[in-house]
Regions:
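Helix-loop-strand module that forms the ligand-binding subsite of alpha/beta enzymes
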Residues: 52-132
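A general structural signal for well-ordered alpha-helical segments in protein cores
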Residues: 3, 16, 20, 57, ...
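Glycine-rich phosphate/pyrophosphate-binding loop and the adjoining helix
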Residues: 4, 45, 134-181
Length: 181
């Protein structure tokens, strides 16, 4: 099974991207997690889209299409998802053949505060309703005080968080298999 990881942070030392790497490390046998690079996706402009998808957007849409499921790791800015993640979602949600439609998905988030991007995760789930994303409900992975759970190189050093991420990936794999029946 192929899962596409999408980080809502472009920061080099992003805890959310590090959480996706940790998910890849704990994924069950036969499951791969590729992390999308959304850094080159331009700001959404329907005039541009009308002339054809820019190469970075076309590549991202194809990555989504080729994936069996999506795993979002969202940062939280002003009680919501990051602008870069919303922008990538906007590009991926457009016709023709919007690749997000009906896609199994899971969400987790990391923050340096206590709440682990909880509000951003709930907001992403709301956006997902309109897009017909099929989100896993449990477990919820809210990685608060992320600076204490990852080392300076971005490696997850907190075993309970690693186990929670593993459970989320397993749940996503099972959910995806159920939806494909």
């Amino acid at each position: 099974m192929k899962i596409l990881g999408i980080s809502g942070s472009l920061r080099k030392g992003s805890h959310n991207t590090a959480a996706l790497r940790a998910a890849s490390e704990v994924a069950p046998d036969g499951v791969t997690i590729e992390i999308a690079d959304i850094s080159q996706i331009p700001l959404y402009n329907d005039d541009v889209r009308a002339q054809g998808y820019p190469p970075a957007v076309a590549h991202f849409r194809e990555q989504i299409r080729a994936a069996d499921a999506l795993l979002f790791a969202t940062a939280e800015y002003n009680y919501s998802i990051s602008g870069v993640l919303k922008n990538a979602i906007d590009w991926a949600s457009r016709p023709p053949e919007a690749p997000l439609t009906g896609k199994p998905a899971a969400v987790m988030g990391a923050s340096m505060g206590l709440f682990g991007a909880a509000r951003a995760q709930y907001h992403l789930r709301q956006i997902g309703v309109f897009l017909d994303l099929k989100f896993v409900n449990k477990p919820e992975v809210m990685i608060g005080t992320a600076q204490e759970r990852f080392d300076a190189e971005g490696k997850l050093i907190h075993d309970p968080t690693r186990e929670l991420i593993r459970k989320l990936v397993v749940s996503l794999v099972e959910w995806t298999a159920l939806l494909k029946r």
